[in-house]
Every structure is written in C-alpha cells, then in structure tokens.
Amino acid sequence: DGAIDIVCAAQQDDGYLDTYYIINGKNHIFTNLKDHHELYCMGHLIEGAVAYYEATGKDKLLKAAARFADYAAAHFGAEEGKCKGYPGHEIAEMALVRLYDVTGEARYLELSKFFIDERGKRPYYFDKEHPEEVKRGHEDDLRYAYNQAHMPVREQDEAVGHSVRAVYLYSGMADIARMTGDESLYAACEKLWDSITK
C-alpha cells in the first residue's frame, strides 16, 4: 500500500502517469511511441492495478490506472483531431480489455480495439514519428516487423519480430475477438497461433 501511495502521488491532475516525461518534459508526451514505452508502462500499470484490486478489493491503484487510461483514450482514436498512433511495445491492448472487464467502461475496450485496428496501416504511423529515417531512405531501420506493425493485424499470418511484444498483441487480439465477435480477428489469431505452435 505504501508503494501504491508513492505511485499515485506522482500522477498528474490530468491523469497522466509516466515519471520519465513528468520529470523531463510533458511537451514530449506520446511523441515517440515506437521507442519509448509510455503505453507499455500504462499497460503494466493497468495489469498490476487489476490484479491488486482482484486480490485485495482495494481500488486506489485501479482508479489511478483508469485515470491514465482515460488520458490515453482522450488522446488516441479514430476521431478527427486524435492521434492515430499505437504502442511500439504492446501490452496496452490486453490490459485495456482487463480494465474494461473490471470497470465495465466501454471506452477501454474501444481504445484496445483502436490500437489493434490501427497497427500496420499505411502510411505507417512510425514514419510520421521518424521522418528523418524515411527521408534518408532508412525505413528498414524502423523495423516494423519487430513491432508487428509491418501490415494490418488481420493480414498477418506469420509470427514475426520480438516474441514478447507479439504474444502481448496476439493476446489482446484474441480478447477483442472474444469480446466483440470479430470473426476476421479470430481467424487472424488462429493463423498466428498455428505459426507459433507448428
């Protein structure tokens, strides 16, 4: 509980909670999704908060995680004016579904679905973040496959890239397919499962 008090004390009034940017400049929040791990950290915060709540019934950390997820949901999405980015290192996708399971707040499910649907679309979001690499003709340095962002997830049939990132993504995809009845996402999950296990 003491550690949770410390974490929650760092949370900003707007709900943002990543101490690197709180300390080093909030003007850089969500400007390097590919390499920096804000959404990854948010995902682990949510996972820990949900597990702690389920084990103890205490909701202080859960409320903090939900506020950070609300901050992200206000920033990312398909709506005009929102950022069309997605996590460079996946876990937020599956964590947001767990947060939805506990709170019943549909915006968390929608944000997870947005991250999954947006991944791999062209033009690549990471190109926008790193125009200097694109200008030099070094798009390969952005390593889309490493982040499972080389093509839309429904078109992926081979597990590639960083294995932990991949399985976090595939778990989130399976959760969304289960929750929404999305048959095309379910079919992609089956192909990726076969790629991993056969």
Where do the model's predicted regions map?
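Glycan-recognition and catalytic cores of secretory/periplasmic carbohydrate-active enzymes
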Residues: 1-198
